[in-house]
Amino acid sequence: MQLNTLSMVHEFLRRTVKPGDFCIDATAGKGRDTALLCRLTGDAGRVLAFDIQEAAMAQTKALLAAEGLTAEVIRDSHANMERYAAAETVDCVVFNFGRLPGGDPSIFTRSDTSVAALEAALRLLKPGGVIAIALYYGGANGYGERDAVMTWLETLDDRKFSVLR
């Protein structure tokens, strides 16, 4: 297995997500995480996928259709995920912060909405639920988002949350 960020996150998800789980892909992008979550949760599960870019939504929908998978693909900011799920009902939330590979380089996740989305994800998580975060930084987005997310992670109560970096 090639070790890169995506393969490590996917291995973590394979060991964590179960059939029937309710999962959110907060940054759908090309749909790879969404498709994996759909396969892992099965017909009894539920998957929401968020993105603000039409191109990302189209790629996600095409991948799901090609694999015969179903998810609710929503064109909205990940910061608004609480509009679509109730508190303490979600088993897993996945984030890939940065930009859509091959997409418009002027569109990328931002620290203000990303931290708001992480806070929303915590409120949506069931006890024992997990959040997986992949941070891609540099380029036009610089390091501000990375720094904001890392600072936010440091504020979590370590008696309630475990953070693996």
Where are these regions (language model features)?
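Helix-to-beta-strand junctions that scaffold the AdoMet/dcAdoMet cofactor pocket
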Residues: 18, 41-42, 125-127
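Conserved glycine-rich SAM-binding loop
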Residues: 29-31
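S-adenosyl-L-methionine
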Residues: 1-22, 26, 35, 39, 57-91
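Conserved SAM-binding motif I beta-strand of class I
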Residues: 46-51
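Class I S-adenosyl-L-methionine
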Residues: 139-165
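Mobile active-site "lid"/loop adjacent to the S-adenosyl-L-methionine
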Residues: 95-117
